[in-house]
């Protein structure tokens, strides 16, 4: 009896000849095209530096330029074609309305470019949530826009900025992130720019949304759990290209034994709207109510919000007769985000009913 191998020799030999060719074909298969991501640097802790590696809370923000920031994460080249632009070099507590407008117009110009697939904005965390929400309202693009920061400077032990930036670029270059509005990536989470806020100033898990994250980033891959339902970006009635200045809107903080001094001073200084950062359900102390009623008669919009830490939820005509007073409620927006929406919305309308509609929809 002939050996079994000998009987099948022609077939075996043919298979052996094909195997190297198949392996070679696999080796020369074209790699997946990398996305083109632009990083706009504005400063903040992510561009900060301390005197030593032990300085995680005492450091100078906005020191490291964008080219050095990108060089600190060489792995970026493996997930995207990245280039950087230095827009500002400031600590974010110093961000102004003019800075928002300039940044917004820069983002819009890039978003219109065919060779840009996604945009990352490095930003200080103090007002990161305000910038993210502003861009959510005014950028007409489905391309991913991701705002990212860090809680520790790059010089600190266990600095979080490198991974945050890596994750931001991964999300910005991911087609699955399109059409989800402006995003925030911090501490491995993908958060909505609309409702995420800085909840603590000394931990790396600083940013949270009362409604939870949209998803997670793990080793450069995005995993999604929910999608935004409020109007944003391409579905927004506001367009950065049509805005030359934001309306003057101020915030007055309420607390036990508060007086009406701040409200009067803000109105006298030219505020067209005052965000009442109230306790609980945006409550207004009895001694302040007459002043707010009078300011509304003078044309100042009064917008009730809540400064509770984990997320307020202000209902109309609860605590105060908003219909009677012709006041507006901020719904679930915290005071600083309510200021952003009012400042944008009042570039189009001064009507309180229209403004209330906008607060419900955005």
From Swiss-Prot:
Native source species: Pseudomonas aeruginosa (strain ATCC 15692 / DSM 22644 / CIP 104116 / JCM 14847 / LMG 12228 / 1C / PRS 101 / PAO1)
Compartments where found: Periplasm
Pfam families: Asparaginase (PF00710), Asparaginase_C (PF17763)
An example molecular function term from Gene Ontology annotations: glutaminase activity
Origin superkingdom: Bacteria
SMART domains attached to this UniProt entry: Asparaginase
UniProt signal peptide: 1-25
Gene Ontology biological process terms in this record: asparagine catabolic process
Subunit structure: Homotetramer.
Protein name: Glutaminase-asparaginase
Enzyme's top EC category: hydrolase
Catalytic reaction(s) noted: L-glutamine + H2O = L-glutamate + NH4(+); L-asparagine + H2O = L-aspartate + NH4(+)
């Amino acid at each position: 009896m002939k050996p079994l191998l000998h009987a099948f020799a022609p077939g075996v030999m043919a298979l052996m000849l094909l195997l190297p060719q198949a392996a070679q074909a696999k080796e020369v298969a074209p790699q997946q095209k990398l996305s083109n991501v632009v990083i706009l640097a504005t400063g903040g802790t992510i561009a900060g530096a301390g005197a030593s590696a032990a300085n995680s809370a005492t450091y100078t923000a906005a020191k490291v330029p964008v080219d050095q920031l990108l060089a600190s994460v060489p792995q970026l080249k493996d997930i995207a074609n990245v280039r950087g632009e230095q827009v500002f070099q400031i600590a974010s507590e110093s961000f102004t309305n003019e800075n928002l407008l300039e940044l917004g117009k820069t983002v819009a110009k890039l978003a219109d470019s065919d060779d840009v697939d996604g945009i990352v904005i490095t930003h200080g965390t103090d007002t990161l949530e305000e910038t993210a929400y502003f861009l959510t309202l005014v950028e007409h693009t489905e391309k991913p826009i991701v705002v990212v920061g860090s809680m520790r400077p790059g010089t600190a032990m266990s600095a979080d900025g490198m991974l945050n930036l890596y994750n931001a670029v991964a999300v910005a270059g991911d087609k699955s992130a399109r059409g989800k509005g402006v995003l925030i990536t911090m501490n491995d989470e993908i958060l909505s720019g609309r409702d995420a806020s800085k909840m603590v100033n000394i931990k790396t898990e600083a940013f949270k949304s009362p409604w939870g994250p949209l998803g997670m980033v793990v080793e450069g891959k995005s995993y999604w759990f929910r999608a935004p339902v409020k109007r944003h970006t391409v579905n927004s009635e506001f367009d950065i290209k049509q805005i030359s200045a934001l309306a003057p809107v101020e915030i007055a903080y309420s607390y036990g034994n508060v007086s009406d001094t701040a409200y009067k001073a803000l109105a006298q200084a030219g505020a067209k709207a005052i965000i009442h950062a109230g306790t609980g359900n945006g409550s207004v102390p009895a001694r302040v109510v007459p002043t707010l009623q009078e300011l509304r008669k003078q044309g100042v919009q009064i917008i009730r919000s809540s400064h509770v830490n984990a997320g307020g939820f202000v209902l109309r005509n609860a605590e105060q007769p908003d219909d009677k007073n012709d006041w507006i409620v901020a719904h679930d927006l915290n005071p600083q985000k309510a200021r952003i929406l009012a400042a944008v919305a009042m570039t189009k309308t001064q009507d309180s009913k229209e403004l209330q509609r906008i607060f419900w929809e955005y």
